[in-house]
Amino acid sequence: MARITVEDCLNQIPNRFKLTLAATYRARELVQGHAPRLDSKDKPTVTALREIASGLTGLEMLRKVPT
């Protein structure tokens, strides 16, 4: 099993605070039933981080957030 680290995700989203928000919102989407963008049997938080590290999810998550 490959380990996912925050450093891998920071290559895609350099700001730690934006990274945290994007991962949180994506994980919430996964919990609500949205389909994962990659095959993963991990928990939603880890899946969200894997998606960010691989470039499948990014800052567009912050644009979807209702204000």
Curated annotation (Swiss-Prot):
The keyword Membrane does not apply. Pfam families: RNA_pol_Rpb6. It comes from the Bacteria. It catalyses: RNA(n) + a ribonucleoside 5'-triphosphate = RNA(n+1) + diphosphate. Its EC number is 2.7.7.6. One of its GO terms (cellular component) is DNA-directed RNA polymerase complex. GO terms for biological process: DNA-templated transcription. One of its GO terms (molecular function) is DNA-directed RNA polymerase activity. Keywords: DNA-directed RNA polymerase, Nucleotidyltransferase, Transcription, Transferase. Signal peptide: none annotated. The keyword Endoplasmic reticulum does not apply. Belongs to the RNA polymerase subunit omega family. NCBIfam families: rpoZ. HAMAP family: RNApol_bact_RpoZ (MF_00366). Promotes RNA polymerase assembly. Latches the N- and C-terminal regions of the beta' subunit thereby facilitating its interaction with the beta and alpha subunits. The RNAP catalytic core consists of 2 alpha, 1 beta, 1 beta' and 1 omega subunit. When a sigma factor is associated with the core the holoenzyme is formed, which can initiate transcription. This is DNA-directed RNA polymerase subunit omega. It comes from Bordetella pertussis (strain Tohama I / ATCC BAA-589 / NCTC 13251). The lineage of its organism: Bacteria, Pseudomonadati, Pseudomonadota, Betaproteobacteria, Burkholderiales.
